[in-house]
Amino acid sequence: MQKDLEQNNVKGKKTASYSHVLMFTGIFGGVQSLKLVVSVVRNKLASYLLGTTGYGLLAVYSSITEFVTNCCNCGIPINTTQKASELYEDGTAEQMKDFACTVRTWVVWTAVAAMLLSVVLSPVLSYFFFEHQWDHCLEVILLTPMVIAFLVAEGECSLLKGMRKVRSVATIESIVAVTTLLSTVPFYYWLGLRGIILALIASTGISAFVHLWFSVRLVPYRIRPFSMRILREGWPFVRRGLPYVISGTAASAAGMAVPMVILSSGNMDDVGLYRAAFALMVGYAGMVFVALEA
């Protein structure tokens, strides 16, 4: 009798888990459809207002940002979701707050690492991406706020997913998709090529703010950057995340190498054309897998 009850409990948990996954996939499938439409409109306006040169610059800045982010995120967004889910189901509110403090503290240190890496790599990236010139270091360094915003958003999103706030995450994705369109196009229109970095900083900053707005209401924001206990508690997640960091860095390095190769024998217009074709053939189709990954 006891064995039958245990089997029924296991089956019930599996059924609930499958239902949760299906609900997650369905909701995010709808969100990805919205993001697809908004992305098409945004890319069309960007190509019209900035031309192929501006679109190429967008590709270069995005690849640099992605590379630095993957180098420094320590795999935290991937590894912390499961632990947050376990604490949400079986732990106490204080344990959840303590874990969120650990995640956010490590995110702060990854942001510091990203700032240092951006400064160190800025001369090299300027040389390879801007016709062997060294005077674009400041532009690369100015991408640092984007990286920090990405790291913050990823950390908060991992907590929300762990707490199974499916609708909150879907709402965030929808808001970010629309606000990205509304916040970038004015910069492109009024400032042209000079407004690209400002537009990217504004859009990623809004994304980080929206993620924080939803997550802080559930778990108050608290960090302890100099607490050895907090750092030790987060270290296992960093250690497990090392393979993800290596694979993500390798993939983003390959993505960054393509514009470098194009620029070695072409110009920024060619990079823009490549990026547009890549978005049509790969980027939009990949949104389906993003919905499944969620």
What are these regions (language model features)?
Residues 2-6, 101-131, 182, 189, ...:
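Alpha-helical transmembrane segments of multi-pass membrane transport and lipid-handling proteins
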Residues 2-21, 200, 211-255:
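Interhelical loop/hinge segments that connect adjacent transmembrane helices in multipass membrane
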Residues 19-35, 61, 73-123:
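Membrane-water interface segments that mark the loop-to-transmembrane alpha-helix transition
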Residues 22-34, 140-146, 159-185, 197:
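Alpha-helical transmembrane segments of multi-pass membrane transporters/permeases
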Residues 44, 56-73, 102-106, 205, ...:
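Alpha-helical transmembrane segments of polytopic membrane transporters and translocases
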Residues 74-90, 162, 220, 277, ...:
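Helix-loop junctions and terminal segments of transmembrane helices
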Residues 116, 120, 131-156, 170-171, ...:
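Alpha-helical transmembrane segments of multi-pass membrane proteins
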Residues 137-141, 170-219, 240, 278:
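Hydrophobic alpha-helical transmembrane segments
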